[in-house]
């Protein structure tokens, strides 16, 4: 079974790391972004505990912002997208309750990545050109 993500943020903001960010995780599955297939090969997956129909906690957003800042410092962020943007029709997350406006407002703290796709998602795939494996 190939199911995993790099990082998971619990409702209380606790961060759990399942896979090192320099390794391949299996969060995206069959996916495509920016003309490239297999997003697991060049992305870092962050899962937020929740569902498509329940709002996320403030603690989760605070933890997400800290993670993005750390990932940007280490790898540099190029794009931030939801799983539904890279696997449309197959993935719905992060869902309509994800606060993309809040994330946009905080992005100066973690560089200036581009936001792509729809404005509401649960699992974030952080895509970056420098993380590509040959």
Give the positions of each predicted feature:
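Basic/polar, cationic surfaces and motifs that engage anionic cell-wall
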Residues: 37, 51-134
């Amino acid at each position: 079974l190939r199911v995993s993500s790099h990082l998971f943020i619990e409702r209380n903001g606790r961060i759990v790391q399942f896979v090192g960010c320099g390794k391949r995780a299996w969060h995206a599955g069959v996916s495509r972004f920016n003309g490239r297939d297999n997003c697991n090969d060049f992305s870092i997956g962050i899962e937020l505990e929740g569902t498509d129909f329940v709002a996320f906690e403030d603690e989760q957003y605070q933890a997400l912002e800290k993670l993005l800042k750390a990932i940007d410092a280490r790898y540099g962020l190029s794009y931030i997208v939801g799983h539904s943007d890279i696997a449309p029709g197959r993935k719905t997350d992060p869902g309509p309750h994800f606060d993309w406006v809040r994330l946009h407002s905080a992005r100066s703290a973690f560089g200036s990545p581009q936001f792509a796709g729809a404005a509401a998602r649960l699992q974030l795939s952080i895509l970056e050109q420098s993380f590509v494996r040959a």
